[in-house]
Amino acid sequence: AGAVWLQGGILTMNGGTIGGDKGVMMNGRALYADGGTANIGGTIQNIHGTDAAWQGQNGVAVHLRSHGEATLASTGEITNVTGTNAGNNCAIWTQFCNFTTKAGSKISHVDGFQLLYFDDLDNNNYSHEVYLNGTISECASGSASLLRSWYGQITFGPNSVIENCSSSSAGGLIYSNNGSHYTFAGTIRDNTASKGMIYLANQGGGGVIATIEETAHIVDNKGLAVRVNNSSNLTMNGGEI
């Protein structure tokens, strides 16, 4: 399942590395959390996804299921993770689970597929959250979106930064597909996405609700800033585009 297989227990990673050594790629997955809690204060690095792993490439760095929780601490880092753009393949996969990145955490060089896929279609009660408050940089998603959701609450905190990332996906850099709730309070800058930075999309499964807060800065990007699809709702309380 993964280099570390968590089943209802607690992982506290205060340091160290999971993945390939310098210049060496590991094939497979770093962390598979089937329930339980993971606190990642070390580094997940140099991992290439493979369909031979259980659940394939759904979460090459972190796979969360069964109401598990994972936090990338202020000292935590995920870097140099690659995979194949197909289906829901991604570096971080979370279904009915909570995933958090703290201020100071770093995610970089996730290339060739999605960084994160979030599915919380669970009676539409939005009981789980992806809360991003660290830095995401230098990710080249190719024909995939950087982030994609299917329902769920996704919050970009005031310390969050997404910079120097790229996507040629029809869903843009951040693709909120059906019923998601988004809060943007951080910075999105110096990115390139031909279909835009944020696509609030309803493809027949429920309108998206999004808020841009006073601390938000969506600036210096190549591509339109925000695209609002039918039955989606965007409220701008402040901030800068």
Spans of features found by a protein language model:
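Extracellular beta-strand/beta-solenoid scaffold signature
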Residues: 1-7, 22-34, 48-67, 79-96, ...
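All-beta strand scaffolds that present successive hydrophobic residues in beta-strands
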Residues: 10-18, 37-44, 70-78, 99-103, ...
